Design a protein with these regions (language model features):
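Lipid deacylating catalytic domains
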Residues: 1-65, 69-76, 116-190, 194-314
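A basic- and aromatic-enriched beta-loop-alpha substructure that forms the phosphate/nucleotide-
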Residues: 64-121
Length: 314
């Protein structure tokens, strides 16, 4: 069985486990190769003294994107518009992304919440909110790091996050896709974006079921886990007194975020998950949330290598 399990993020509904693996596995192995070369040079031990790069068959992709694929023909494809941002949670998440984009990109205007509050009628309030959603989408699609991304893609990704957090059936089936790859051989779990939420919850669930899973390292990339109102407070299991539960089957955790990744609104998650989390910052260039950019970062390679070597907390 695979020693490394990768859990993908949003927007993969038209891919498959195999197509994702073609992109993910080489980049993950490349990141470890960088860390291996660094360790060999530092220790002067040569390549034989560093952790081996995992073989392709040692890396598995936990795929759940099909759960978000719309049924029917191409004509039924989801052509989302501003009016489709309907729930309060969707609106809250969109506003968080907008605020973070404005904080990290001087070209993005900051949100003005004054238009969404006050003593107005329901219809007027809905009209103001729709106008705010349109402004948010305009701001985000004009951001330096989201140039070329369409409204329907942003809204679709937004809805996938919210559906996972609010739809019990989606949550159960998505976690089952991850759990299917967690075995006594699993040493490292690498997760990206929404996949970090799945990975965390799947590890907690496996521990609760008493399964023989002992992961040396969890590597979370571009994670929204630290967003208290939207994500953290909706986790299973729920946080206790503001502190999230540490999975009993996990030895070490490295959390990595790009300095401008708007999805990782809270880049330091140690305050919520405990001081054992090692929060690191990287720079992914113009593709701040791209999974392959994260995987090729040497910081990611080091974390994966430490997990494979069994030196995760040394």
């Amino acid at each position: 069985m695979a020693r490394v399990v990768f859990v993908h993020g949003v927007g993969k509904q038209y891919l498959s486990e195999d197509s994702l693996a073609r992109d993910i596995v080489p980049e993950l192995r490349g990141g470890v190769r960088l860390a291996r070369a660094e360790a060999a040079a530092r220790d002067g031990a040569g390549a034989d003294g560093a952790v081996a790069v995992p073989a392709p068959e040692d890396v598995a992709v936990a795929f759940y994107g099909d759960l978000f694929r719309p049924a029917g023909t191409r004509a039924d494809d989801e052509n989302f518009q501003a009016a489709d941002v309907e729930s309060d949670l969707e609106f809250e998440l969109l506003m968080a992304w907008w605020a973070e984009a404005a904080r990290t990109d001087p070209q993005v205007p900051a949100p003005d919440e004054s238009g969404t509050r006050g003593k107005v009628g329901w219809a007027a309030a809905q009209g103001l909110r729709l106008k705010t959603v349109r402004r948010a989408l305009d701001a985000l699609t004009g951001a330096q790091f989201l140039e070329g991304v369409r409204d329907r893609v942003l809204i679709g990704n937004l809805k996938q996050v919210v559906r996972y957090l609010t739809d019990p059936d989606i949550r159960i089936r998505a976690q089952a896709a991850v759990a299917a790859h967690l075995t006594p051989d699993t040493r490292v779990v690498v997760a990206h974006s929404l996949g970090t939420v799945l990975a965390y919850e799947a590890l907690c669930a496996a521990a609760a079921r008493g399964e023989k899973v002992n992961v040396q390292m969890l590597v979370t990339l571009g994670s929204p886990l630290g967003m208290r109102g939207v994500v953290l407070n909706r986790l299973h299991p729920a946080p206790v007194d503001g502190r999230a539960v540490w999975p009993r089957n996990l030895r070490a955790w490295t959390n990595i975020a790009d300095t401008t990744d708007i999805v990782a609104v809270v880049r330091e998650i140690a305050p919520a998950f405990g001081p054992a989390v090692d929060d690191l910052v990287v720079h992914n260039g113009t593709h701040m949330h791209d999974a392959t950019r994260y995987l090729t970062a040497i910081e990611t390679g080091r974390a994966v290598a430490a997990g494979l070597a069994g030196t995760a907390d040394e």
